[in-house]
């Protein structure tokens, strides 16, 4: 698979040869869906909680006698049928949202995503991406010259200047190959990878 090479001015150079094992796989929509859903589920923190009828603070006194009032039977005001009563199936912080995906499936899913992005021409390669100073303006000018507005930058080592400059840009993220997740790969319109990072990705996913 040939990936397009960009220079600092956004002009295309000679293509970069990449491994077909990582960048030349068939598109597997079901596998990609499974990997992305598992990633989103595992990112959930489980920080919501509701009370059941044992936890709400109510008296246990019977609201009215069982018979003779003409009203429906009622045992206590903490009943889920009553306003202010407990929930029948309350959400709990102890809920486990995690999904398990085997390592081979996870790697195959990432390879399928990279391959489809390469076929769509959404992956570009640069020799390196560094900044002289941690200035957002400098990075914004570079991306504008390359025609990039929504971009995930994958670099072999995250330069401090590059990281600081990218934090204030919307729709821009900078990660190392080992932290490239399936959701980010799909979310961003373009993927910009350094040459050294391409080799690292191939090593991680081969």
Swiss-Prot record:
**Region Disordered: start and end of each range?**
44-78
The record's InterPro entries line, in alphabetical order, gives: Ribosomal_uL4 (IPR002136), Ribosomal_uL4-like (IPR013005), Ribosomal_uL4_dom_sf (IPR023574)
Q: Which molecular function terms from Gene Ontology are attached?
A: rRNA binding; structural constituent of ribosome
Tell me the Gene Ontology biological-process terms attached to this UniProt entry. translation
What's the domain of life for this entry? Bacteria
What are its GO cellular component terms? ribonucleoprotein complex; ribosome
List, as start-end ranges, the regions of compositional bias called Basic residues.
58-70
Keywords for this entry?
Ribonucleoprotein, Ribosomal protein, RNA-binding, rRNA-binding
List the disulfide bonds in this chain.
none
User: What function does the entry list?
Assistant: One of the primary rRNA binding proteins, this protein initially binds near the 5'-end of the 23S rRNA. It is important during the early stages of 50S assembly. It makes multiple contacts with different domains of the 23S rRNA in the assembled 50S subunit and ribosome. Forms part of the polypeptide exit tunnel.
Q: Which family does it belong to?
A: Belongs to the universal ribosomal protein uL4 family.
Q: How does it assemble?
A: Part of the 50S ribosomal subunit.
UniProt name for this protein = Large ribosomal subunit protein uL4
Kindly list the organism's lineage: Bacteria, Pseudomonadati, Pseudomonadota, Betaproteobacteria, Burkholderiales
């Amino acid at each position: 698979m040939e990936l397009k090479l960009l220079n600092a001015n956004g002009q295309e150079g000679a293509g970069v040869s990449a491994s077909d094992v990582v960048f030349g796989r068939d598109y597997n929509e079901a596998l990609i869906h499974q990997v992305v859903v598992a990633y989103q589920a595992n990112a959930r923190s489980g920080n919501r909680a509701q009370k059941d009828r044992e936890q709400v603070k109510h008296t246990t006194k019977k609201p009215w006698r069982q018979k003779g009032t003409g009203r429906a039977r009622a045992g206590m005001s903490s009943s889920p049928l009553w306003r202010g009563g407990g929930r029948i199936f309350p959400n709990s912080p102890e809920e486990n949202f995690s999904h398990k995906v085997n390592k081979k499936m996870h790697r195959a899913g990432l390879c399928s995503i990279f391959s489809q992005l390469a076929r769509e021409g959404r992956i570009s390669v640069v020799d390196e991406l560094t900044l002289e100073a941690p200035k957002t303006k400098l990075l914004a000018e570079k991306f504008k010259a390359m025609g990039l507005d929504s971009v995930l930058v994958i670099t072999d080592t995250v330069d401090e200047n590059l990281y600081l400059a990218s934090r204030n840009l919307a729709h821009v993220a900078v990660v190392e190959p080992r932290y490239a997740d399936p959701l980010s790969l799909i979310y961003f319109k373009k993927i910009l990878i350094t040459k050294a990072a391409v080799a690292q990705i191939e090593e991680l996913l081969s």
